Regions:
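Active-site neighborhoods of divalent-metal-dependent phosphate/nucleic-acid chemistry enzymes
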Residues: 57, 61-64, 68-116, 127
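Short, well-structured N-terminal submotif of metal-dependent ribonuclease cores
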Residues: 1-37, 51-65, 106, 115-120, ...
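Generic structural signal for small/hydrophobic residues in well-ordered secondary structure
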Residues: 7-8, 45, 84, 103
Length: 127
């Protein structure tokens, strides 16, 4: 299965695995799954780390290097951006909306820890 991980799952998998639920850990550890990340996650980490948020202490450059070295990047393309307009107005977080659009356009499952994101239609799994 192809899985797009949200930012929290990426951060926890990279630096705080104890915060992962058993379900999330099982999905990430399953070698039959292809894992992906969105550049929107790096954007979110860079912005929130720059704001000195306690939950975003990971250096986005190091995170990117580790993720890129494993071939996990799902680039943001025009179709993803255009799909955002058709999403329901569940909430306004631009990062979440990009992930939902990417997952929908690509036909892959977005794995998230956010119950608001899980309310969007499409291939989304709350863990």
């Amino acid at each position: 299965m192809k899985l797009l991980l949200d930012t929290h799952l990426l951060l926890w998998a990279a630096s705080d695995a104890g915060r992962l639920s058993n379900e999330a850990r099982g999905l990430i550890d399953n070698r039959d799954n292809a894992l992906f990340f969105s550049p929107a996650s790096l954007w979110e980490v860079a912005i929130k780390r720059g704001l000195r948020r306690d939950d975003f202490k990971v250096d986005p450059r190091l995170l990117h290097r580790g993720l890129r070295d494993h071939g996990y990047e799902l680039p943001i393309i025009s179709q993803h951006v255009l799909a955002i307009e058709g999403l329901p107005a569940i909430h306004k977080d631009p990062f979440d909306r990009v992930w939902v659009a990417q997952a929908t356009v690509e036909g892959i499952t977005l794995v998230t820890t956010d119950s608001l994101v899980a309310r969007y239609p499409g291939p989304i799994q709350l863990v």
